[in-house]
């Protein structure tokens, strides 16, 4: 669905050749949100993710898809695995002749930020403990 604002801005979500194209930015204004709460245990979630190398299966995907993407070795996550850990970042859509799952890496960024913050807190606590033990 596409929307045009009074100022002429175009926004929405589009599918093109099976790709889910989003905006270059995402609206994140607090005034647009409700029920705001922190993501629980983001570090635990991130540690369960398994980054992988892979190649697109040309026997399943149309050649147009493969040609429109980088060929050869890719890097990413497996949507089914991510869905078990962080289901909010996985979406299933009809692309070409099938229903396929995809990972919204933009949404995953919020979980990664939470994990870094949680890990940094642990580091600071350990540094404090080391300082106390050394004195």
Segments and roles (model prediction):
Residues 42-45, 78, 112:
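Stable alpha-helical elements in mature extracytoplasmic
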Residues 34-48:
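Periplasmic N-terminal gating module of Gram-negative TonB-dependent outer-membrane receptors
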Residues 51-52, 89:
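Acidic glycine-/aspartate-rich tracts in secreted/extracellular proteins
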Residues 63-71:
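Short, surface-exposed loop/helix-turn segments at secondary-structure junctions
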Residues 76-77, 102:
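Short aromatic/basic micro-patch
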Residues 54, 82:
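Active-site-adjacent helical/loop segments in soluble small-molecule enzymes
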């Amino acid at each position: 669905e596409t929307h045009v604002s009074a100022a002429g801005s175009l926004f929405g979500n589009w599918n093109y050749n099976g790709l889910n194209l989003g905006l270059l930015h995402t609206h994140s204004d607090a005034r647009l949100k409700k029920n705001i709460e922190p993501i629980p245990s983001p570090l635990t979630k991130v540690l369960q993710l398994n980054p992988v190398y892979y190649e697109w299966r040309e026997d399943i995907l149309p050649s147009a898809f493969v040609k429109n993407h980088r060929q050869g070795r890719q890097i990413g996550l497996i949507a089914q695995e991510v869905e078990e850990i962080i289901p909010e970042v996985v979406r299933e859509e009809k692309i070409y002749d099938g229903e396929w799952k995809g990972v919204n890496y933009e949404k995953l960024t919020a979980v990664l930020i939470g994990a870094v913050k949680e890990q940094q807190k642990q580091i600071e606590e350990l540094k404090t403990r080391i300082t106390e033990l050394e004195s």
